[in-house]
């Protein structure tokens, strides 16, 4: 797994073309309208759909207003610097509504649940599950076979670039609504109880709880049984 350096992310955002992509449903005498190659136009003589940059499409609409009867614009971002990650080739289960930015690393058989938000530079290891509404900030790193509970937040670090990101090592279970602050490392096999606010490193194979989180015990067989990672939830269809 690769972690992006903060300066690489800053440079990427600085140099990226800021975009306002739109989808426009259009109706009118469209045989009279010429669409440039930079706009994807799926149209017939009377109606169609356009995909492209708003500034270009707005110019088309304004200059051809006498031919256009009506249109509806769908737009979900403005001057966006970071595109969404192309998910088609990723060998993981990613559910609807997850927001995953470009330059995120996702290991095989990971699971990203509904409405999870994964920012640029984050890394998710093989077989790890990011549950509903969880947030992984910029450069947050989750190891293999972990579970990040619903509503948990792993704080992001892009600026200042010298700051250390959150690192969650392998086989960690993080409960619902946990907050892990910048620079914290959660050690291998640890368990963070629901609702905890983690401000300091968590030793491996310990259970922490509270605000701020404190070690309450070492991992025992009872804890292992309660926090077992089920591989059945991470299985994908056989490749064809």
UniProtKB/Swiss-Prot annotation:
Keywords: Acyltransferase, Amino-acid biosynthesis, Diaminopimelate biosynthesis, Lysine biosynthesis, Repeat, Transferase. Coiled coil: none annotated. GO terms for biological process: diaminopimelate biosynthetic process; lysine biosynthetic process via diaminopimelate. InterPro entries: DapH, DapH_N, Hexapep, Hexapep_transf_CS, Trans_hexapeptide_repeat, Trimer_LpxA-like_sf. SUPFAM superfamilies: Trimeric LpxA-like enzymes. GO terms for molecular function: tetrahydrodipicolinate N-acetyltransferase activity. It catalyses: (S)-2,3,4,5-tetrahydrodipicolinate + acetyl-CoA + H2O = L-2-acetamido-6-oxoheptanedioate + CoA. This is 2,3,4,5-tetrahydropyridine-2,6-dicarboxylate N-acetyltransferase. It comes from Bacillus anthracis.
